[in-house]
């Protein structure tokens, strides 16, 4: 019953669509805060980091819980900037519903598409809120059309705006057929419902008919009412929309202006009415590590304990905070739990509910809850934890590869150890941040999703960890892969410390589909040796080979860049009990892998970026020339409100300093977004 009174939602959008402002209003109207902060003042509740307040953007996802109409709503506010898309990915993995905030002027923007497809991957129901209806050029219906055309799903207006731009003053609710207005003197807390004015009744009836047309496609009861010419009851509409949203038949749309305190309470109503409670979602799929088979876990508090760690955050006093989503069972302070993948047992010191960067200690959480555990020293993002009675590993998360690197060194030698510790914490927090040492120069290299991403991280090193560092110029992070399939058999004999060691194995390396990732397959059918029979090689030997291959992927083939999309099959093993050991098999595996990959025609890949650029019509030729001169390809153009939108792709290695050239070519009148698209063979 408690789960029915819960919602776990995310607020997601393209940068500057008004996502954090919308969340701030939600906190105010639910009574969670008593004064609304503004982004321009660096005073919003969910943007608590100094870097967020200084830059006016969300960098880290932040969680809070509010209460609306007797329902507890856990809200995760996520970044809108492409450099921090990992924060969106891990939030979506554990959410039951999403509010997508769209700008009424900008409409569907690049990061809107990214988060939409991320939500599709996890099959998450959503409602949409068209914000900034007060802006000049706002067009509610164009946003709906663009969503329908881009994503192939019906966009159903549950409201229509009264006016737009500077004349926007309220909405018409098509469910109740009432006009809604907000009192500015009460900061929008007081709402007034009025009959629809005669001048607007025809438009409202037409919009309601369109809404009912879509709803009736998926509801026999609504169809019967419409055909009989009867009034469709409000509660029936709520129930049928809720069912259709849960099944992702269509997406309901609302509108408003969060900055001017218009439209947020109906959005909260929509979250309660239409987005699913935890137990209304499908049973979560996992993999039983003992039975070696997929299993489905029902979201019930009476089941075995099972939770997913979806975020790690360092806190100076508490240490590592592990954000978890509870999928089954109950967890209490002091309980002993098992990290299922790592087979490590640890004790829960404290359980916290977060309100941005503040916390409240609780004694118990259960299925459906999102909370923080303190005390898990070995946990990483994507780990599954349980009580040990049900050893099930849940699906983890997919994170994009870092595409840009900078060299890093401490300002003084005494800070070297502290820098290493800091990098360890940051890389544990952020799965898209990696650290490695250049094999040729010995330089320390850090890699991330973009210049802003790395700038934020190096600023945190200085300000949060008091580590002064010298940062080199950014350069592109390349990858290596192979074109052919090659087998290699290798037998290694070495004498170490007067003792002879032997290892023999056969590997096959193969090129995988772009984006498929690296994968290790153990296909040992025959094990040759003086004591072994088929399938009797010790598990530590197979594990040593896999461990060595995973390390070899990171080390690259010829150029030292990490490997992508390379499959490795272990076909056979020659093992002798007295002369074979894991370390000699690791050496053999690395050598065999390297020789096979060299023969498999290795090549280097570079990151290609998607660019969307907006400029005045008179500047479009000059702006396109800037892209073409940097090796870019123009994919298409659109016109919007007298401005031209240029869609292009370009190699990242040629995009450093792009913003300066674009400003010059457009005389300061252009803006652009750039995000990673894919890796492609270097020309």
Curated annotation (Swiss-Prot):
Domain tr-type G: 4-279
SUPFAM superfamilies to which the protein is assigned, alphabetical: EF-G C-terminal domain-like, P-loop containing nucleoside triphosphate hydrolases, Ribosomal protein S5 domain 2-like, Translation proteins
Domain of life, per lineage: Bacteria
Keywords assigned: Cytoplasm, Elongation factor, GTP-binding, Nucleotide-binding, Protein biosynthesis
CDD domains with a match to the protein in the record: EF-G, EFG_III, EFG_like_IV, EFG_mtEFG_C, EFG_mtEFG_II
Cell compartment(s), UniProt: Cytoplasm
A GO cellular-component term linked to this record: cytoplasm
Any one GO BP annotation for this protein: ribosome disassembly
Binding-site list for GTP: 13-20, 77-81, 131-134
UniProt-recorded Gene Ontology molecular function terms: GTP binding; GTPase activity; translation elongation factor activity
Described function: Catalyzes the GTP-dependent ribosomal translocation step during translation elongation. During this step, the ribosome changes from the pre-translocational (PRE) to the post-translocational (POST) state as the newly formed A-site-bound peptidyl-tRNA and P-site-bound deacylated tRNA move to the P and E sites, respectively. Catalyzes the coordinated movement of the two tRNA molecules, the mRNA and conformational changes in the ribosome.
Family: Belongs to the TRAFAC class translation factor GTPase superfamily. Classic translation factor GTPase family. EF-G/EF-2 subfamily.
Protein name: Elongation factor G 2
Species whose genome carries this gene: Treponema pallidum (strain Nichols)
């Amino acid at each position: 019953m408690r789960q029915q009174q819960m919602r776990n939602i995310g607020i997601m959008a393209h940068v500057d669509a008004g996502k954090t402002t919308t969340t701030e209003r939600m906190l105010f109207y639910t009574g969670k805060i008593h004064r609304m902060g503004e982004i321009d003042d660096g005073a919003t509740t969910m943007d608590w980091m100094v870097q967020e307040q200084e830059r006016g953007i969300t960098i880290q996802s932040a969680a809070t819980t509010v209460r609306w109409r007797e329902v507890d709503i856990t809200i995760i506010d996520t970044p809108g900037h492409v450099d921090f898309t990992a924060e969106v990915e891990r939030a979506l993995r554990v959410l039951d519903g999403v509010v997508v905030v769209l700008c009424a002027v900008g409409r569907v923007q690049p990061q809107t598409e990214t988060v939409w497809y991320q939500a599709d991957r996890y099959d998450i129901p959503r409602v949409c809120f068209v914000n900034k209806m007060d802006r000049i050029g706002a067009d509610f219906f164009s946003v709906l059309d663009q969503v329908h055309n881009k994503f192939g799903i019906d966009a159903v207006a549950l409201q229509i705006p009264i006016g737009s731009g500077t004349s926007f003053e309220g909405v018409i609710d098509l469910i109740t057929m009432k006009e809604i207005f907000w009192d500015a003197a009460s900061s929008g807390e007081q709402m007034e419902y009025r009959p629809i004015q005669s001048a607007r009744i025809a438009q409202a009836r037409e919009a309601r008919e369109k809404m009912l047309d879509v709803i009736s496609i998926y509801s026999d009861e609504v169809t019967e009412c419409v055909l009989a010419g009867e009034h469709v009851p409000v509660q029936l509409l709520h129930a049928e929309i809720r069912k259709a949203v849960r099944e992702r038949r269509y997406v309901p749309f609302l509108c408003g202006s969060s900055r001017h305190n218009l439209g947020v309470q109906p959005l909260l109503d929509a979250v309660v009415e239409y987005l699913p409670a935890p137990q209304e979602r499908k049973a979560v799929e996992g993999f039983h590590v003992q039975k070696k088979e997929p299993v489905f876990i029902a979201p019930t508090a009476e089941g075995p304990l099972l939770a997913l760690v979806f975020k790690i955050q360092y806190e100076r006093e508490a240490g590592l905070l592990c954000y978890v989503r509870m999928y089954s069972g109950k967890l209490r302070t002091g309980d002993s739990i098992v990290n299922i993948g790592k087979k490590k047992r640890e004790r829960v010191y404290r359980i916290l509910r977060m309100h941005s960067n503040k916390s409240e200690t609780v004694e118990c959480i259960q299925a459906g809850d999102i909370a923080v555990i303190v005390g898990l020293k070995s946990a990483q993002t994507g780990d599954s934890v349980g009580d040990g009675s049900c050893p099930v590993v849940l699906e983890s998360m997919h994170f994009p590869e870092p595409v840009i690197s900078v060299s890093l060194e401490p300002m003084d030698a005494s800070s070297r150890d502290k820098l290493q510790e800091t990098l360890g914490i940051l890389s544990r927090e952020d799965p898209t941040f990696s650290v490695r040492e250049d094999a040729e120069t010995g330089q320390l290299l850090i890699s991330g999703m973009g210049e802003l991403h790395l700038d934020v991280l190096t600023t945190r090193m200085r300000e949060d960890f008091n580590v002064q560092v010298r940062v080199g110029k950014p350069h592109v992070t390349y990858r290596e892969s192979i074109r052919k399939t090659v087998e290699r058999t290798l037998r290694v004999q070495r004498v170490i410390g007067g003792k002879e060691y032997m290892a023999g194995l056969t590997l096959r390396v193969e090129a995988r589909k772009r984006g498929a990732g690296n994968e290790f397959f153990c296909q040992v059918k025959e094990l040759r040796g003086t004591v072994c029979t088929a399938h009797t090689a010790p598990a530590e030997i197979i594990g040593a080979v896999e461990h060595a291959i995973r390390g070899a992927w990171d080390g690259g083939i010829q150029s030292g860049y990490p490997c992508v999309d390379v499959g490795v099959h272990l076909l056979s093993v020659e093992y002798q009990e007295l002369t074979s050991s894991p370390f000699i098999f690791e050496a053999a595996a690395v050598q065999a892998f390297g020789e096979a990959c060299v023969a498999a025609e290795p090549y280097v890949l570079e990151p290609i970026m998607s660019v969307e650029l907006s400029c005045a019509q008179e500047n479009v030729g000059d702006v396109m020339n800037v892209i073409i001169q940097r090796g870019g390809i123009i994919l298409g153009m659109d016109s919007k409100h007298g401005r031209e939108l240029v869609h292009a792709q370009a190699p990242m290695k040629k995009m450093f300093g792009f913003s300066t050239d674009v400003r010059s070519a457009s005389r300061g009148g252009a803006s652009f977004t750039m995000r990673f698209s894919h890796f492609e063979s270097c020309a």
